[in-house]
């Protein structure tokens, strides 16, 4: 149905202008019920959209500032690949203090989602120690040496508690800050994983030090290399993942 589905939000629902969006959606500002909102049209499955909608509603109820789904006139949270969500005011984080606030918000996200079910079709970084595919990741498409490096980085996360991670919070465009709150937007990459992946932030906003920072940075670079393979960005991220020392004969 495409954008014609916007009519399910009311006869006065209209598109306004395109917005920068995630990798999986056509994103526009829209007006629904006389209020500014955001419409995202993509090819995600109903199960995927239901997972995201339930997550955002849960986080909103628990006091996090997130875009929440606006129902259609008959009460659906999405229809024909279209989800309409509330518009978030604010600008991107710029200073170390801003990024510390982002880290605090991420840690609250992680606390609120311990034990959350995995996003349909996704796998965590530690799942990929054995599996080869999961949504946008296909390790079989990467050189074996690159896969070995990524898995070595993820192996350091084994045994850690899992929760929902935002998946791309170090992109300033995915955060909206005002004096009173921090809003996380663009949940395309959210899934269940180890929280370390969310905490490699500009200005080291999460204040990780020593081995904790190294583990998180290596695992995060490996994840972004795998999920984006094989464009220039993914190769830059792979270059940050340490090579595995060659075995030596004794």
Over which residues does each language-model region extend?
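ATP-binding glycine-rich phosphate-binding loop
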Residues: 9-31
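A conserved alpha-helical element in kinase catalytic cores
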Residues: 40-80, 92-109
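A glycine-centered beta->alpha junction motif in the catalytic cores
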Residues: 81-95, 131-139, 222-238
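A cross-family kinase active-site recognition segment
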Residues: 93-145, 152, 161-162
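Catalytic-loop of the protein kinase fold
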Residues: 164-167, 172
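Active-site Asp-x-Gly
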Residues: 176-217
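Helix-rich C-terminal or lid/interface subdomains of diverse kinases
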Residues: 200-250
